[in-house]
Amino acid sequence: MIIWTHRGNPGPENTLDAFKQAWEDGIRHFETDIHATSDGVLVLAHDSNIRRLTGVDLEIQEIAFKDLSNESLYGIYKWCTLDELVDAFPAAQISIDIKSDPTLDAFFQWLKGRKIENFVVGSFSSKRVDAVRKRYPLLRTALTSREVLLILTRMHFLIDSHSANRFAMIPVKSHGLRILTKQFIKVCKNKKIEIFVWTVNSLDEAISLKQLGISGVVTDNYPVLL
């Protein structure tokens, strides 16, 4: 079963130190989020505002990377760029959550000339995912919320023929609705769509999910799953 470390957790969130530790522990699949600074540098960050991690009330897209670098994460760690992550771990599989429209534009610029085999891209914005598919049809992408709903309502025939380049990264449930159903698993298997479930932090749950036939899990606590 494939284990994705969620933002490098349980290490310091979205830092190079966290991903280095995960790699040393044998994790080869990284899940992260990106935002673009005002000068187009892609940094690993879940929130658009840096207050939670730095105590400073600033929006990433409104400041240059040089200025962002002056605000340490947790008072200790450097901001990690997508460049740094990829350069440090060229063999890692990296799932990238694109957090904003300006970030999407910067990501397209960043991706030019790069090999795309080790990247998978997702977003809660179906519009962004559709834009990625249009520009890079061979780049693996996550199912959009619309596509997940089509599967759950047995309208999966409306999902286009490029679904083999996609993967499903889903919770077991969302807002009281069961997502990981037998129907969902069956359709994904028929369409050769791998399923990864988030966020799974116990070995018992991971084992139960594996028995259902999923490909792997996204976790905040990979050591308990090794």
Where would I find each of the regions flagged by the language model?
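Phosphate-group recognition and catalysis centered on beta-loop-alpha active-site segments
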Residues: 1-226
